[in-house]
């Protein structure tokens, strides 16, 4: 008689093991490592940390067993970012909200927990909407629904909503009016890779029946006030801008996936808009932020708007020819241009100077940034107001980026800069697929596909699609008087016109950063006699031809208004 074998596989064993390990950690039993984060002590087990994080495995595997150094300091991690990751290692449950998402993402990247970092990135990029059903859900669930492998989104108020393992769309029962923002922001994500069954949490009396609510709420519009305040694209609420309120528009509804589609991901971004109405500006609590996605029609509408010169103005006004002039002087006039077909496209895309200066013009990017809510409020704590300029006695650039350390004079510039570190580029070109962080960058990019050239050099009639290309043309062409090469490399004797080129040259010679700092603190890199009388006379005698230039300084740039006032066409 043959030997009979029996194999038993327990699906709850891994869950029980994690629960018991977490109990041992809370009681302080068998903890063999101490982690210090910002002077706060955490006790844990080496085997659990090494199994969850490649960073800890590299740190702990190489240690000798008889070594008494069991304290590990994490200098680049905050307490608010480390606690959710430690709980995730022992419970397979990640609890994040809009207040600690940046800290958790930075800590997960530093600790090489890439799956958690990917989840945080998806949470930042996606739009999480909550649907409010009219009828109360059933309290009891079938046995098949209790064993459902779909993960749950659990809010801080205790409601649990079923959702697919890829976290596509969610529901919850929640009061709409005057609810705490902190409760609306917070949620708990069950890891799809963990063996923890989500059916263990179905004992709550507020569990939603996904199959029942699907047929009831299929055609119900979703209340956009329940969206997170900084969801895609970071909570831009157009309802508080009366000038940009559109006319009657069809109400869009959110179609929830059926029971057979629970394993599929929803669309990349879910757009939900109720009927657009103008709301009066009240308190901050009354203004409800909705989730918007820039559709192809809206992108086309944004691109077709007039490109005013004020929107294309740059902060570097010292290198702009005739910085006292308005950039409308650079716009192509259909009557004065001789390009032909290009002017027809420009005449359609660009208004006259009177229309660009009208009072009903839409606000620029800086004004729109005032109404944007960002998840970086913890890092932005300036001494001055967001709408005020720095005081004369204070620092020139009080707003500093916590990631790279770049400082800015305005809070709007810092907010726009933080989008670069987030990696979110919500504006995508529908022709070539290139993505941009700002809507204005997409607008200028679309002009290249349409063949519209909005800026023209009034000296050589060259046309450009952006003001940056025009500035580059003025630098590399012979339209401006060449600057003298006043920066000299003491190593090889090379001369340069600006310090930036000298820095690039010194880096090519493998100069360290400290050496560069000491090098530029002294004035030895400047030629001693670069501003003598002979060089000034040489620059004044520069052949300007028929173009009128001012000669009140050694380095001049053409003043376009003078050339235009003579009535000479290029």
Curated annotation (Swiss-Prot):
<feature type="zinc finger region" description="C2H2-type 2">
    <location>
        <begin position="427"/>
        <end position="449"/>
    </location>
</feature>
<feature type="compositionally biased region" description="Low complexity">
    <location>
        <begin position="304"/>
        <end position="318"/>
    </location>
</feature>
<feature type="modified residue" description="Phosphoserine">
    <location>
        <position position="159"/>
    </location>
</feature>
<feature type="cross-link" description="Glycyl lysine isopeptide (Lys-Gly) (interchain with G-Cter in SUMO2)">
    <location>
        <position position="290"/>
    </location>
</feature>
<keyword id="KW-0862">Zinc</keyword>
<dbReference type="GO" id="GO:0008270">
    <property type="term" value="F:zinc ion binding"/>
</dbReference>
<feature type="zinc finger region" description="C2H2-type 1">
    <location>
        <begin position="399"/>
        <end position="421"/>
    </location>
</feature>
<keyword id="KW-0677">Repeat</keyword>
<keyword id="KW-0539">Nucleus</keyword>
<feature type="cross-link" description="Glycyl lysine isopeptide (Lys-Gly) (interchain with G-Cter in SUMO2)">
    <location>
        <position position="4"/>
    </location>
</feature>
<feature type="modified residue" description="Phosphoserine">
    <location>
        <position position="194"/>
    </location>
</feature>
<keyword id="KW-0479">Metal-binding</keyword>
<feature type="region of interest" description="Disordered">
    <location>
        <begin position="243"/>
        <end position="267"/>
    </location>
</feature>
<keyword id="KW-0805">Transcription regulation</keyword>
<dbReference type="Pfam" id="PF00651">
    <property type="entry name" value="BTB"/>
</dbReference>
<feature type="modified residue" description="Phosphoserine">
    <location>
        <position position="165"/>
    </location>
</feature>
<feature type="zinc finger region" description="C2H2-type 3">
    <location>
        <begin position="455"/>
        <end position="479"/>
    </location>
</feature>
<feature type="modified residue" description="Phosphoserine">
    <location>
        <position position="161"/>
    </location>
</feature>
<feature type="compositionally biased region" description="Polar residues">
    <location>
        <begin position="199"/>
        <end position="220"/>
    </location>
</feature>
<keyword id="KW-0238">DNA-binding</keyword>
<dbReference type="GO" id="GO:0005634">
    <property type="term" value="C:nucleus"/>
</dbReference>
<feature type="region of interest" description="Disordered">
    <location>
        <begin position="295"/>
        <end position="369"/>
    </location>
</feature>
<keyword id="KW-0804">Transcription</keyword>
<dbReference type="GO" id="GO:0003677">
    <property type="term" value="F:DNA binding"/>
</dbReference>
<feature type="compositionally biased region" description="Polar residues">
    <location>
        <begin position="352"/>
        <end position="361"/>
    </location>
</feature>
<protein>
    <recommendedName>
        <fullName>Zinc finger and BTB domain-containing protein 44</fullName>
    </recommendedName>
</protein>
<comment type="function">
    <text>May be involved in transcriptional regulation.</text>
</comment>
<feature type="region of interest" description="Disordered">
    <location>
        <begin position="194"/>
        <end position="220"/>
    </location>
</feature>
<keyword id="KW-0597">Phosphoprotein</keyword>
<keyword id="KW-1017">Isopeptide bond</keyword>
<feature type="domain" description="BTB">
    <location>
        <begin position="31"/>
        <end position="98"/>
    </location>
</feature>
<dbReference type="InterPro" id="IPR000210">
    <property type="entry name" value="BTB/POZ_dom"/>
</dbReference>
<keyword id="KW-0832">Ubl conjugation</keyword>
<dbReference type="InterPro" id="IPR036236">
    <property type="entry name" value="Znf_C2H2_sf"/>
</dbReference>
<dbReference type="Pfam" id="PF00096">
    <property type="entry name" value="zf-C2H2"/>
</dbReference>
<feature type="modified residue" description="Phosphoserine">
    <location>
        <position position="135"/>
    </location>
</feature>
<dbReference type="InterPro" id="IPR013087">
    <property type="entry name" value="Znf_C2H2_type"/>
</dbReference>
<feature type="zinc finger region" description="C2H2-type 4">
    <location>
        <begin position="487"/>
        <end position="511"/>
    </location>
</feature>
<feature type="modified residue" description="Phosphoserine">
    <location>
        <position position="191"/>
    </location>
</feature>
<dbReference type="InterPro" id="IPR011333">
    <property type="entry name" value="SKP1/BTB/POZ_sf"/>
</dbReference>
<feature type="modified residue" description="Phosphothreonine">
    <location>
        <position position="200"/>
    </location>
</feature>
<keyword id="KW-0863">Zinc-finger</keyword>
């Amino acid at each position: 008689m043959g030997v009979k074998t029996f194999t038993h596989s327990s699906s709850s064993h891994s869950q029980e093991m994690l629960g018991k390990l977490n109990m041992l950690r809370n009681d302080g039993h068998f903890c063999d490592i101490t982690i210090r984060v910002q002077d706060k002590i955490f006790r844990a087990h080496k085997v659990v940390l090494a199994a969850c994080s490649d960073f800890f495995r590299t740190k702990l595997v190489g240690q000798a067993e008889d070594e008494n150094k069991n304290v590990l300091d994490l200098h680049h991690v905050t307490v608010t970012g480390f606690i959710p990751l430690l709980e995730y290692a022992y419970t397979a449950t990640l609890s994040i909200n809009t207040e600690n998402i940046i800290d958790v993402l930075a800590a997960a990247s530093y600790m090489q927990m890439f799956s958690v970092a990917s989840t945080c990135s998806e949470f930042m990029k996606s739009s999480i909407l909550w649907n409010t059903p009219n009828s109360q859900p059933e309290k009891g669930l079938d046995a098949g629904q209790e064993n459902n492998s779909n993960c749950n989104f659990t809010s801080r108020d205790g409601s649990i909503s079923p959702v697919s393992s890829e976290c596509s769309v969610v529901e919850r029962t929640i009061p709409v009016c005057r609810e705490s923002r902190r409760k609306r922001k917070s949620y708990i994500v069950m890891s799809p890779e963990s063996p923890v069954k989500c059916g263990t949490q179905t004992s709550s009396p507020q569990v939603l029946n996904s199959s029942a609510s699907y047929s009831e709420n299929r055609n119900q519009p979703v209340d956009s006030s329940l969206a997170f305040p900084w969801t895609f694209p970071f909570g831009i609420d157009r309802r508080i801008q009366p000038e940009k309120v559109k006319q009657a528009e069809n109400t869009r509804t959110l179609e929830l996936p059926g029971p057979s589609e629970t394993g599929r991901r929803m669309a990349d971004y879910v757009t939900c808009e109720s009927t657009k109405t103008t709301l009066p500006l009240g308190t901050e609590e009354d203004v409800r932020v909705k989730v918007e996605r820039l559709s192809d029609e809206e992108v086309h509408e944004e691109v077709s708007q007039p490109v005013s010169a004020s929107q294309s103005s740059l902060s570097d006004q010292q290198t702009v020819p005739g910085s006292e002039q308005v950039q409308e002087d650079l716009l192509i006039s259909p009557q004065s241009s001789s390009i032909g077909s290009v002017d027809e496209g420009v005449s359609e895309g660009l208004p006259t100077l009177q229309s660009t200066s009208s009072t009903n013009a839409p606000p620029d990017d800086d004004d729109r940034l005032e109404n944007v809510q960002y998840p970086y409020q913890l890092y932005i704590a300036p001494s001055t107001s967001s709408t005020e300029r720095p005081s004369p006695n204070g620092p020139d650039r009080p707003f500093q980026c916590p990631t790279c350390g770049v400082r800015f004079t305005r809070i709007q510039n810092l907010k726009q800069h933080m989008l670069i570190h987030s990696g979110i580029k919500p504006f995508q070109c529908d022709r070539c697929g290139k993505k941009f962080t700002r809507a204005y960058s997409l607008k200028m990019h679309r002009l290249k596909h349409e063949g519209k050239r909005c800026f023209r050099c009034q000296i050589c009639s060259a046309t450009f699609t952006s003001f940056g290309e025009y500035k580059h043309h003025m630098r590399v062409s012979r339209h401006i008087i060449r600057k003298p090469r006043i920066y000299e490399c003491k190593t090889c004797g090379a001369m340069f016109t600006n310090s930036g080129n000298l820095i690039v040259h010194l880096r090519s010679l493998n100069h360290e950063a400290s050496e560069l700092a000491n090098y530029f603190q002294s004035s030895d890199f400047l030629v001693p006699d670069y501003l003598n009388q002979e060089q000034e006379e040489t620059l004044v005698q520069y052949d300007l031809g028929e173009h009128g230039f001012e000669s009140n300084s050694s380095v001049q740039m053409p003043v376009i208004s003078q050339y235009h006032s003579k009535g000479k066409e290029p």
